[in-house]
């Protein structure tokens, strides 16, 4: 792999300021999803190494939380600057291990860095309260303190941003963190922690443990020194982790599955709706928890929208993310390909028609697909595809589409396009989702609270609210 700074390609885990192999010497192979080639290996660590990382985090905690907010902020600010300075290398690493086009990878690095920049400033805005006393001789004060040692388990689809959204607020609050990245995409995490080290983040404050999900995750949830876990991934695994954390009453933040509706009303600007659908559906090849999974189009504009969407999809260029001009890379692996094929076959068997795409090209490359006349009984109406499949459902009126949109256990992101302002407010308030994109298909940023309701999770990331999950509220009652 050709990088300007070869030291960013790390094949060891980072624990307590040291680059280490697994105790037993075992490794995990990391492959390029575009070529199938082995990029390298990382240590297959387990319980013992994870425990040492947690103990190092606990040992580093007193000194880190004792720093002033301004001192922690300065170190985070330097980490942000190093990410921007090394954006090209970080993006190339990401594209190689994850597959997304280089332009998207560069965008993710900027997005990931924005959380470090934001929380570097939020570190200095952790305010308490003074409450009027309930008696003349009482003074009531509320302060906020770091929760302690924290843990994070992050996914492969956004291997940099999902880390900084968690590590940024944790470190800003004065907490320490042990991170377990996805085994498919560990190199982005290891490069980020190398830059954190260069930024002056002390040993033990941020460690990265690669290896067995069961053993590493089990120690993170089972070790009583860990006071909070943040996880991004499937609802099934989120439930399991929540159960494991219950033993020690750990604080838990969960960003789980989604099944986002994307609604096009008959008064929408169709060109803008198509533009938003392309961004929402096909960004990262549909492998995002907030991507449009169900596209609902009102009867009067259904055919026109489908035609315009097909024309836009035809312009997408599929290929290796490192090749210039590529807009759509591979899916992460064969299981992801199989899920897309399964949803297409199920929908077609129930009456849907393939308007465009629908076929495997080779390896992990799959054609961006549009299905029309999709019935409500299709699996894709209930299940998250996590791939480049856009199923178009018809609807008659506002009440019908709101009912269909809310008919799911998930509640992460939703989108709709409309011009009528009364409708905008009615629909936005009626949709049972943590986030609503109105006349836009791209809603994620560092200043807004990201998170879902129902089975899509607990807590929020980003924004002024993101740091709250890493703080404990303490009330002081003073007699004067």
Swiss-Prot record:
Question: What's its top-level EC category?
Answer: oxidoreductase
Q: Which UniProt keywords apply?
A: NADP, Oxidoreductase
Q: Which reaction does it catalyse?
A: 5-oxopentanoate + NADP(+) + H2O = glutarate + NADPH + 2 H(+)
Q: What EC number(s) does its UniProt record assign?
A: 1.2.1.-
Q: Where is the active site?
A: 255 (proton acceptor), 289 (nucleophile)
InterPro entries found in the cross-reference section: Ald_DH/histidinol_DH (IPR016161), Ald_DH_C (IPR016163), Ald_DH_CS_CYS (IPR016160), Ald_DH_CS_GLU (IPR029510), Ald_DH_N (IPR016162), Aldehyde_DH_dom (IPR015590), Aldehyde_DH_Superfamily (IPR050740), Succ_semiAld_DH (IPR010102)
Q: Which family does it belong to?
A: Belongs to the aldehyde dehydrogenase family.
* Pathway in which this enzyme or protein is active: Amino-acid degradation
- Give the transmembrane ranges: none
> What is this protein for, i.e. what is its function?
Catalyzes the conversion of 5-oxopentanoate (glutarate semialdehyde) to glutarate. Involved in L-lysine degradation.
- Where is the secretion signal located? none
Q: Which residues form a coiled coil?
A: none
Name the gene behind this protein. davD
Name under which the protein is recorded: Glutarate-semialdehyde dehydrogenase
Q: Where does NADP(+) bind?
A: 156-157, 180-183, 233-234, 256, 384
Keyword set includes S-adenosyl-L-methionine: no
Cellular component (GO) terms are: cytosol
Q: Name one Pfam family in it.
A: Aldedh
């Amino acid at each position: 792999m050709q990088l300007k700074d070869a030291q960013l390609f790390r094949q060891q885990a980072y624990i307590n300021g040291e680059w280490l192999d697994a105790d037993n010497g075992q490794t995990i192979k990391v492959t390029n999803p575009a070529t199938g080639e082995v990029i390298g290996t990382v240590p297959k660590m387990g319980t013992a190494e994870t425990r040492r990382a947690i103990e190092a985090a606990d040992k580093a905690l007193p000194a880190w939380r004792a720093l002033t907010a301004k001192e922690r902020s300065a170190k985070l600010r330097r980490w942000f600057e190093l990410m921007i300075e090394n954006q090209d290398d970080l993006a190339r690493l990401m594209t190689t291990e994850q597959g997304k086009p280089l332009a998207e990878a560069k965008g993710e690095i900027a997005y990931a860095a924005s959380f470090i920049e934001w929380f570097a400033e939020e570190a200095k805005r952790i305010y308490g309260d003074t409450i009027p006393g309930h008696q003349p001789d009482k003074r009531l004060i509320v302060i906020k303190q770091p929760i302690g040692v924290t843990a994070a388990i992050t996914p492969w689809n956004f291997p940099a941003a999902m880390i900084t959204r968690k590590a940024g607020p944790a470190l800003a609050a004065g907490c320490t963190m042990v991170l377990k990245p996805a085994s498919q995409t560990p190199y982005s995490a290891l490069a980020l922690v190398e830059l954190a080290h260069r930024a002056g983040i002390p040993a033990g404050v941020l460690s990265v443990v690669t290896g067995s999900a069961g053993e590493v995750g089990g120690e993170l949830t089972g070790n009583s020194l860990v006071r909070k876990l943040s996880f991004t991934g499937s609802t099934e695994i989120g439930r399991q982790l929540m159960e494991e954390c219950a033993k020690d009453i750990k604080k838990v933040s969960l960003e789980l599955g989604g099944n986002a509706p994307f609604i096009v009303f008959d008064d929408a600007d169709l060109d803008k709706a198509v533009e938003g659908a392309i961004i929402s559906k096909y960004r990262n090849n549909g492998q995002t928890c907030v991507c449009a999974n169900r596209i609902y189009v009102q009867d009067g504009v259904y055919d026109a929208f489908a035609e315009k969407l097909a024309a836009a999809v035809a312009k997408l260029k599929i290929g290796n993310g490192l090749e210039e001009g590529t807009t759509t890379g591979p899916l992460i692996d064969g299981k992801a390909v199989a899920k897309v094929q399964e949803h297409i076959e199920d929908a077609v068997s129930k009456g849907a028609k393939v308007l465009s795409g629908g076929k495997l090209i080779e390896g992990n490359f799959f054609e961006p697909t549009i299905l029309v006349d999709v019935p409500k009984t299709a699996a894709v109406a209930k299940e998250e595809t996590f791939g480049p499949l856009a199923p178009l459902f018809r609807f008659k009126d506002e009440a019908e589409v709101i009912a269909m949109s809310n008919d799911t256990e998930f509640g992460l992101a939703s989108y709709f396009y409309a011009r009528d302002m009364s409708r905008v407010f009615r629909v936005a308030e009626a949709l049972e989702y943590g986030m609503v994109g109105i006349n836009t298909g791209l809603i994620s940023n560092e200043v807004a609270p990201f998170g879902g309701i129902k089975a899509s999770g607990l807590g929020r990331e980003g924004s002024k609210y993101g740091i709250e999950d890493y703080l404990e509220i303490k009330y002081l009652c003073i007699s004067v």
